[in-house]
Regions:
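Gly/serine-rich nucleotide phosphate-binding loop at the start of the catalytic core
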Residues: 1-77
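Positively charged, low-complexity nucleic-acid-binding target-recognition regions
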Residues: 37, 318-320, 324-433
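Substrate-contacting helices/loops that form the catalytic groove of nucleic-acid
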Residues: 42-44, 48-65, 175-330, 402-433
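Acidic carboxylate diad motif detector
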Residues: 52-173, 323
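Short acidic-glycine loop/turn motifs at beta-strand connectors
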Residues: 143, 175, 216-219, 360, ...
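Short polybasic amphipathic segments
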Residues: 144-150, 211-215, 371-374
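Secondary-structure transition/turn motif
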Residues: 146-156, 183-188, 217-219, 379
């Protein structure tokens, strides 16, 4: 079986190469901004978005008008047409329009309303964001800790691991003052014989904010709270940005405000903190998901309505929810289970894992402050997260038994809603008795 794997390395360019990277990244950003403006004008005049071929023709026109674009390779420039075309048509999908209306209804200030109206639509890029990227679908080489890209040359990178497989695409991206390369390789996985389905070594996982993960066998993994540990320092450095001055210059009779050197330095400090938080979080998720897949033959988790949580929560709760990265944890578990021929199940989000008694299957309502599940029917007292993990395990095993041999390694629970309705009927009957 073949799969794609991405290797990310930090580039170590000299001054001349660094200037070329900035120039090529700036060319791509300039072209994107020009295409966004062209797309908006085109839509205003003709009532539709330009097609990908029409955007590509506009690139030819822009290259004739701006000679500096010819210094960049054509493929990284042409990819802007494909991406803008996708973004345009994604912005008019029914779900995006619905979400835009919801955000507009909640907006109170003119700034919030303007932001809501532009939600999901392509936006102009700023050079001050320092997040330029250059995409190469081909015309690059990887050799002994260096990459070769057309019209730039050889660029050394800090090689911290071997690159396996056949390189397919290359993305060079800027993160503040640093540059990175992401090499997507096609690798052939070793043939692993999938173990027969056995309930003995399958685990159900309930994720949360207080405890990151509670397993059905009673073990727990604490929430590292990566952002909270760096929040005080981050706020301090962000406040310093507001104290740094702008420089006003006159260009063609117009006053233009730009960041001073000290302001740019301070912004880079904030970017470094954000990068550290992101890397620590990613490292934790990789190690935790690897541990789960290595230890167990099967992993069962529930689908969470994270978007609804963020819409209904307060700012502090939303910050914690974003920091814990439940979706990314589930994604890593899923692809690692697939690569290692392990069982993986995501049960329905409406399955009442927390409200259901893991012993008698009766259902009772619970508040968030209730940390112990006390069943009014059978008298069971158990930690609410442990109780939920057991229910997730049992529901996932039902799904596995129904799908193993037909669907394959991964499956999504389809019987959870029907079982939930039936469980409520049983609960009402038991309580009435």
């Amino acid at each position: 079986m073949k799969t794609l794997k991405t290797y990310k390395f930090r580039l170590n360019p000299n001054e001349a190469t660094l200037e070329l990277l900035k120039q090529h990244g700036g060319n791509g950003r300039f072209l994107w901004n020009q295409l966004v403006s062209f797309s908006k004008d085109f839509n205003d005049q003709k009532g539709r978005f330009p097609t990908q071929s029409e955007l590509q023709k506009q690139i030819v026109v822009l290259k004739e008008e701006n000679d500096f674009l010819k210094t960049s390779h054509s493929q990284p420039l042409q990819i802007n047409a494909k991406r803008l075309n996708k973004t345009n048509f994604d912005s008019i999908k029914p779900e995006k329009i619905k979400e835009r209306k919801i955000k507009l209804a909640k907006a109170k200030t003119p700034k919030q309303k303007a932001k809501a109206l532009n939600f999901g639509k392509p936006k102009h890029k700023s050079k001050h964001d320092k997040n330029d990227s250059i995409f190469y679908p081909q015309n690059f080489k990887v050799k002994k800790g260096r990459i070769f890209v057309a019209k730039i040359g050889w660029i050394p990178f800090i090689k911290h691991r071997d690159i396996l497989g056949v390189p397919k695409t290359l993305t060079i991206n800027q993160d503040g003052e640093q540059w990175f390369c992401s090499i997507v390789c096609e690798i052939k996985l070793k043939q692993i014989n999938k173990k027969p389905l056995s309930e003995a070594n399958i685990v159900g996982i309930d994720v949360g904010l207080t405890t990151f993960a509670t397993m059905s066998d009673g073990s727990k993994i604490e929430n590292p709270r990566t952002l909270r540990k760096n929040l005080k320092k981050l706020k301090k450095e962000q406040k310093r940005i507001s104290r740094r001055k702008f420089i006003k210059t006159e260009i063609n009779g117009n006053s233009v405000k730009s960041s001073s050197k000290n302001r740019i330095k301070q912004k880079n400090k904030v970017r470094r903190i954000h990068r550290k938080v992101k890397n620590v979080r990613s490292d934790f998720l990789h190690k935790t998901s690897h541990y789960m897949i290595a230890k167990y033959d099967g992993v069962i988790i529930e689908t969470l309505g994270i978007k609804n949580m963020l819409e209904n929560g307060n700012s502090n709760q939303n910050r914690e929810t974003n920091d814990v990265s439940w979706f990314e944890f589930g994604r890593k578990l899923e692809y690692k289970a697939k690569q290692n021929e392990k069982y993986f199940v995501k049960i329905e989000r409406f399955f009442p894992s927390t409200k259901t008694c893991s012993k008698c299957k009766s259902i009772k309502d619970m508040e968030l402050k209730d940390r112990t599940y006390k069943c009014p029917v059978c008298g069971l007292e158990i930690n609410r997260d442990h109780n939920a993990a057991i229910n997730i395990l049992e529901e996932g095993i039902k799904v596995l038994k129904n799908t193993t041999g037909t669907v394959g390694i991964n499956a999504c629970g389809q019987s959870a809603v029907a079982d939930m309705v039936e469980a409520r009927k049983v609960s009402k009957t038991a309580c009435a008795a």
